[in-house]
Amino acid sequence: MSLTNKNVVFVAGLGGIGLDTSRELVKRDLKNLVILDRIDNPAAIAELKAVNPKVTVTFYPYDVTVPVAETTKLLKTIFAQIKTIDVLINGAGILDDHQIERTIAVNYTGLVNTTTAILDFWDKRKGGPGGIICNIGSVTGFNAIYQVPVYSGSKAAVVNFTSSLAKLAPITGVTAYTVNPGITKTTLVHKFNSWLDVEPRVAEKLLEHPTQTSQQCAENFVKAIELNKNGAIWKLDLGTLEPITWTKHWDSGI
């Protein structure tokens, strides 16, 4: 899929991986890049505009933990402004297993709520045009970092939820896939807390393993968006992009 003249809404598009991905996106000659983030960063927005002045870059403050109704209201404003949204990227995430409720609220519930809100506009059963959802998971959604089971569990939930969305595409008209970064050099992994402090040195130990830069991750992130494969589970690790084949152990039969 060519991203030229597309309208993309990026939740958490100013974070570590997010900002580098936003830089790559504007190079693709989007029509609009709408960034929803909790904290404004005028310098980063100005930089993105300078990378490609042809792209309209807009920022709206957004906390993914707000009720669905508030998200729907914000999306209504965005649709009124740019008329169509082609791609939604759900990228909000925290890594701190001391904050159990907030980890689940940001990493999973917020993603589900944002998705639910945009279906109000996209669902073909309501006369919507359909759309594309790219959800950011993590390799911990495949195999946990067991010292951070809350974070890992939230990312496993993202993979499962997104796979369900993909299978619902014939009904809703909305396709979906996950991008799942491996250990990436961002502030997220420099210092974080393990669950019940089972491993106080978890961040230090994790960074002893091979990593990738946020730029490497961003480049593959945008490649995955351009490939636009419904139901794909992409692994973005060590500077590579690889599709994951999920093993089926059970089928509901419905």
From Swiss-Prot:
A Pfam family of this chain: adh_short
Primary enzyme class: oxidoreductase
GO molecular function: alcohol dehydrogenase (NAD+) activity
Residues where substrate binds: 138
Key words, A-Z: NAD, Oxidoreductase
InterPro entries documented for this protein: ADH_Drosophila-type, NAD(P)-bd_dom_sf, Sc_DH/Rdtase_CS, SDR_fam
GO terms of biological process kind: alcohol metabolic process
Catalytic residue positions: 151 (proton acceptor)
Top-level taxon: Eukaryota
Reaction(s) catalysed by this chain's protein: a primary alcohol + NAD(+) = an aldehyde + NADH + H(+); a secondary alcohol + NAD(+) = a ketone + NADH + H(+)
EC number: 1.1.1.1
Keyword NAD: yes
CDD domains named in the record: ADH_SDR_c_like
Annotated residues for binding of NAD(+): 10-33
Entry GO terms, CC: cytosol
PANTHER family assigned: ALCOHOL DEHYDROGENASE (PTHR42901:SF1)
Subunit structure, as described in the record: Homodimer.
Family of this protein: Belongs to the short-chain dehydrogenases/reductases (SDR) family.
Protein name: Alcohol dehydrogenase
